[in-house]
């Protein structure tokens, strides 16, 4: 990554303080900072693009959501271990799989417990795509034809012959 790369600010100073605290606690619990990890020295709620590695299950970063430019890197031995790691989460909004083997990417995507999965692209949305997560990342869908069903009350009406009751 180009060290001159910058990002937009976080939504608020409070969001930046929370994110910096998460990184500090992760490092105190054994995570390594590959790059970044701090505030950008300028006016506003800007944080350096950050990569954390060496995160073990007891680390708070293993269970928390990071809302900002922080990527968590994990080492796994195989596809099954990667899927198990991804699914061992209290959250499930979206995820991405990057691979040259598209069939494998689709297979992995179908096994990961999230509301949205993308193969060879970062998560994103359009009005035509259903948006929503599972677990602690939400319930139901917004947008698309799936989203409109969240606003529809469905009713079952079952009719039997009156003679069948006698």
Feature-to-residue mapping (PLM):
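ALDH superfamily catalytic-core signature
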Residues: 1-57, 85, 119, 164-166
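Conserved C-terminal structural/oligomerization subdomain of aldehyde/semialdehyde dehydrogenase
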Residues: 39, 46-166
């Amino acid at each position: 990554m180009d060290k001159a790369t910058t990002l937009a600010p976080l939504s608020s100073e409070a969001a930046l303080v929370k994110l910096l605290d998460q990184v500090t606690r992760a490092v105190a619990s054994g995570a390594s900072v590959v790059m970044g990890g701090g505030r950008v020295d300028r006016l506003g709620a800007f944080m350096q693009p950050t990569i954390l590695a060496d995160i073990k299950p007891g680390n708070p970063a293993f269970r928390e959501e990071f809302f900002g430019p922080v990527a968590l890197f994990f080492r796994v031995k195989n596809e099954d271990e990667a899927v198990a790691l991804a699914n061992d989460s209290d959250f499930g909004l979206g995820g991405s799989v990057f691979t040259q083997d598209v069939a494998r990417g689709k297979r992995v995507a179908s096994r990961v417990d999230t509301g949205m999965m993308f193969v060879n692209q970062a998560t994103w949305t359009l009005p035509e795509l259903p948006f929503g997560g599972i677990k602690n990342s939400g319930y139901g869908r917004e947008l698309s034809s799936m989203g409109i069903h969240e606003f529809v009350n469905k009713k079952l009406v079952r009719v039997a012959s009156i003679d069948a009751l006698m």
